Curated annotation (Swiss-Prot):
SUPFAM superfamilies: Cystine-knot cytokines. Disulfide bonds join C131-C179, C135-C181. Residues 200-213 have a biased composition (Basic residues). Residues 158-162 are annotated as: Receptor binding site. It comes from Oryctolagus cuniculus. PANTHER family: PLATELET-DERIVED GROWTH FACTOR (PTHR11633), PLATELET-DERIVED GROWTH FACTOR SUBUNIT A (PTHR11633:SF3). Belongs to the PDGF/VEGF growth factor family. Homodimer; antiparallel disulfide-linked dimer. Heterodimer with PDGFB; antiparallel disulfide-linked dimer. The PDGFA homodimer interacts with PDGFRA homodimers, and with heterodimers formed by PDGFRA and PDGFRB. The heterodimer composed of PDGFA and PDGFB interacts with PDGFRA homodimers, and with heterodimers formed by PDGFRA and PDGFRB. Interacts with CSPG4. CDD domains: PDGF. Residues 1-20 form the signal peptide. The keyword Glycoprotein applies. This is Platelet-derived growth factor subunit A. GO terms for cellular component: cell surface; extracellular space; membrane. GO terms for molecular function: collagen binding; growth factor activity; platelet-derived growth factor receptor binding; protein homodimerization activity.
Length: 213
């Protein structure tokens, strides 16, 4: 098991978060780790081109009881049997790969009514698909590569003159369809928001006409 522990330590060294903090690791190795799919220690072994992994057996506990010095003493009082420890099988860690998973999304109050605070939302949270998981190196992050937006109806409950008033409000939800390990940057949803802002600002700005002198 010591050899497996050494292999895990070696793998953790290769999976360091940035090259600047690991000057002894070649950049091409980090790039290869970032692009590769690693599902097990065997995959890591093949990727790092490690030919074989040995196994060392733990030393067996001594069956001789402490305090036994002579055969005569053993004959008079036999030692109690010492239980033999059995090696436990330790399972291999399963990586949480970058993919879509169902997560709980709490509906922001600003999406229902940004001008008021005295109301309730039902349901207060829903299930959506989002990209979660980890990548082989921290230089890349699990990000959505394709998104989808859908609208749902929620109930807005407020009290007017001590009487409950219910109103249905549409809320826009974002679903992640595909994920990828990529460098940290603005995702497709951010690019869409920025494009919308540019369009709005373009409408507000008008070119000034120069009067002839």
């Amino acid at each position: 098991m010591r050899t497996w522990a050494c292999l895990l330590l070696l793998g953790c060294g290769y999976l360091a978060h940035v090259l600047a903090e690991e000057p002894g690791i070649p950049r091409d190795v980090l790039d290869r780790l970032a692009r590769s799919q690693i599902h097990s220690i065997r995959d890591l072994q093949r990727l790092l081109e490690i030919d074989s992994v040995g196994a060392e057996d733990a030393p067996e506990p001594s069956l001789r009881a402490p305090g036994v010095h002579t055969a005569r003493h053993v004959a008079e009082k036999p030692p109690a049997p010492v239980p033999v420890r059995r090696k436990r099988t330790i399972e291999e860690a399963i990586p949480a790969i970058c993919k879509t998973r169902t997560v709980i999304y709490e509906i922001p109050r600003s999406q229902v009514d940004p001008t008021s605070a005295n109301f309730l939302i039902w349901p207060p949270c829903v299930e959506v698909k989002r990209c979660t998981g980890c990548c082989n190196t921290s230089s890349v992050k699990c990000q959505p590569s394709r998104v989808h937006h859908r609208s749902v109806k929620v109930a807005k409950v407020e009290y007017v003159r001590k009487k409950p008033k219910l109103k249905e409000v549409q809320v826009r939800l974002e679903e992640h369809l595909e994920c990828a390990c990529a460098a940290s940057s603005a995702g497709p949803e951010h690019r869409e928001e920025e494009a919308g802002r540019r369009r709005e600002s373009g409408k507000k700005r008008k070119r000034k006409r120069l009067r002839p002198t």
